[in-house]
Amino acid sequence: MSAHNTNESAVGKCPFHEQKEEKSVLARGAGGGTSNRDWWPEQLRVDLLNQHSRRSNPLNEHFNYREEFAKLDYPQLKADLKSLLNDSQEWWPADWGSYIGLFIRMAWHSAGTYRTVDGRGGSGRGQQRFAPLNAWPDNVSLDKARRLLWPVKQKYGQKISWADLYILAGNVALENSGFRTFGFAAGREDVWEPDLDINWGEEKEWLTHRHPESLANAPLGATEMGLIYVNPEGPEASGNPASAAPAIRATFGNMGMNDEEIVALIAGGHTLGKTHGAGEASHVGVDPEAAPLESQGLGWTSSYGSGSGADAITSGLEVIWTQTPTQWSNYFFENLFKYEWVQTHSPAGAIQFEAQDAQASIPDPFDADKKRKPTMLVTDLTLRFDPEFEKISRRFLQDPQSFNEAFARAWFKLTHRDMGPKARYLGPEVPKEDLIWQDPLPAPVHQPSPGEINDVKAQIAQSGLSVSELVSVAWASASTFRGGDKRGGANGARLALAPQKEWPVNAIASRALPQLQAIQQASGKISLADTLVLAGVVGIEQAAAAAGVSIDVPFTPGRVDARQEQTDIDSFDLLQPLADGFRNYRRVTGGPSTETLLIDKAQQLTLSTPELTVLVGGLRVLGTNFDGGKHGVLTEHAGVLSNDFFVNLLDMRTAWRAADDSAELFEGYDRKSGEVRYSATRADLVFGSNAILRASAEVYASADAQQKFITDFVAAWGKVMDLDRFDIR
C-alpha cells in the first residue's frame, strides 16, 4: 500500500477551507471578544494620547520629510502629474479623456474636512486613505483617484507625501485646464493610521441630517454625516435652492470662509468636470472598508453596465455645468443667469435642475456625437436665488478676472488652511504674500545672546512676581497651540494682544504682563514672546531650587512679536479654550465631562499620557489655577516643585465626596477626623480614578520619584513651550 493518504475527502483540499469551527482557536484572535468599550462605552479616551506612535510608522526613526522633499525633482513630478491627467485607464476611463475633475474633487475632499472650531480635519496628514473618510458616501470613487495616483507616488517614494500629493494633483489639474493658481506649499506629513480624536458626529447612519443651527457650536463641518459640506439636493433633499443658503454658510463658515469665498469655491469647483449618476444607487456595492479582500482596497463596485465611464455612479447626480468641462471658463455664471431652470431628476432619481429652452451645448464625456442641455445642482442655484450670494455671483459674471482671483485665493486657503504658519511651507511655489489666516509673524531681527538672556532672567527674578505668576504667564502664552492646524503657541506673544489678553482664563497672566513688558522694553532687543517663556523658565527654576534641586530649564530663543493688525480677532477667538484642565478652568457647563475636555486639551498639545500626568501634577503644586484658587493644590508648600500632588491624591487617609449636585467640585476629608483637607475638581481626581492615568500617577507618587518627577516635568514643559517653533525644526 502507498504511504500517501488516499482519503478522497482530504485530497486536493485547501486546509484554510476546513468548515469545522474550533471555537477555542477562534477565540484566540487578537482583539476579538467583547472589548472594554463594549462594557464601558463612557470610558475616558486616554488612548487618544497614544495614537500615531513610532510603532505604527514604517519609516526610519530619523526620517526627515523636509530633507526628503528637498531632494525631489519638483518640475518632473508636476510633469508626471500632467501626463497622468490625460492618460485614461481602461479600468477607470476618464471623462473627456481627462481626470481633471476627479483630481480636483479628490484634493477638495481631502482638505474640505477641516474645521476652524477645533482645528482638526483637513489634508495635513493624508487621512483620506483611512476610515472613515475613505468610505464616506461623499467620497465615492475617490478610491479610484488615489489608485490612479499610485504610480506617481511609487516613483517618488517618500520624497512626496500622500497628503501633499493629493493637493498638488488638484493644483496641477487646475493649471492643466488653463487656470492660474495662487501657489502651492508642501509640508504635510503622512501618518499611518486613522485619526481617532476627530469627532465626526454622533449619528449612527450615513447621511443623517443636521440642522445648520446645530453646527454653530459644534466642531462639525457638514450638515449630514458622511458629506463634506451640504446635501447637493438641498436640505434633506428638499430640492429648494433658497433653503440651502443657511446650510452652505454654516458649513463653509466652519472652515473660515466668507460669502465671496463660498461663491468662488462652489463656482470654481463646478466649472470643471461632472457628477456621476448613470443609474440607480442599488447597483453600487459596498464601500472600500466593507469590500472583500480581493477588492484590494477599492469599493463601490457597480453592476450597472460597465460600472465605469459612461455608466459610472458616484453621487447619483448627473450634472455637467459648462460647455468646456476640461477647460477653465466663466460658463458657470453665464449659464446660471442666462437660463431659467426647471427641476428634474437624474437617471438615479436624484433632484437636479436643467436649463429650460436651452440648446444642447454640453459635450458628452464619452460620445463626441452627443450633446446635453446645461444642468445644475440644487445648491448651485443657491448662488442665484440667495440675495447676498446673487450679488457676488453677478459681479463675477460681469468681471471674470475678479472671479479668477477670488477662486485662486479661496482655493489656496481651502487647501492650506490646516497647515499652520508659513514656516512649515516647502517648495518653489510658496506665495510671497502673507495672508491674515496664516497668522503671519514678522521676520526675526535679533537673536539674543546667552548674556542677554541671563540679564533678562535676572530682572524677571527680581521683579517680585511669584512663581505662580511667572509659570502662569508662560503657560497662557504657549498653551493655545493646536496640533490639528498648528495654530497658536507662544511665538508672536499674542497673549498681549486682543482677543487673548481679554480671555477670563488668562486673568492672572494678564496681571503679570505689564511688568514683563517693561522688562522686555528695557532690554531693548529680546522679544516679548521670548520674555514670556523666560518667565516660566525662571519660575520653574525657582520652584525646583525650593525643592532642593538645581536645574537649568531648556530655553530656545528666537521668537518674535506679532502686531495687532497681523491678528484676526475672530479667528483667534476660536483658540479660547472651552476648558483648560491644566489650570482648572472651564468656561461652559454641560456637554463633555471636565476630564474629557482635559484629554482633548492634552491631545491638542500633542502630549502623551505621562506628559499630561506630570504637567498637571507640577502645575498644581506651583499654584497656576486660572483664578489663583486652591482646587487641586494638594500640598502645604505651594510654589515648590514637588510630587506632593500625587502623594496626597493617592493617600488612602483622605476620602473624597462631591461638594454639590454638579459633581464638579470635591472635598477631600480625613477618614478618621472628618476634617476637610483639600478641594479638587474632576480634572484633579481623574488621576486617581482612571486606571490608566492612575498608573502614571503612581509612578510619580513613589518614594523614589522626586527627581524623575522634576526631570519629566521640565521635559514636558519644554515641549509645550516649543510646540510652535517650526522655524527651528
Curated annotation (Swiss-Prot):
> What reaction is this protein's catalytic activity?
H2O2 + AH2 = A + 2 H2O; 2 H2O2 = O2 + 2 H2O
Question: Which species is listed as the source?
Answer: Erwinia tasmaniensis (strain DSM 17950 / CFBP 7177 / CIP 109463 / NCPPB 4357 / Et1/99)
User: Where's the Tryptophyl-tyrosyl-methioninium (Tyr-Met) (with W-108) crosslink?
Assistant: 229-255
Q: Is Oxidoreductase one of the keywords UniProt gives this record?
A: yes
Name-wise, this protein is Catalase-peroxidase
Catalytic machinery residues: 109 (proton acceptor)
Question: Does this entry carry the keyword GTP-binding?
Answer: no
Describe its function: Bifunctional enzyme with both catalase and broad-spectrum peroxidase activity.
Checking NCBIfam families in the record gives: cat_per_HPI (TIGR00198), PRK15061.1 (NF011635)
Known EC number: 1.11.1.21
Any Pfam family: peroxidase
Report the gene name: katG
Q: How does it assemble?
A: Homodimer or homotetramer.
* Gene Ontology biological-process entries: cellular response to hydrogen peroxide; hydrogen peroxide catabolic process
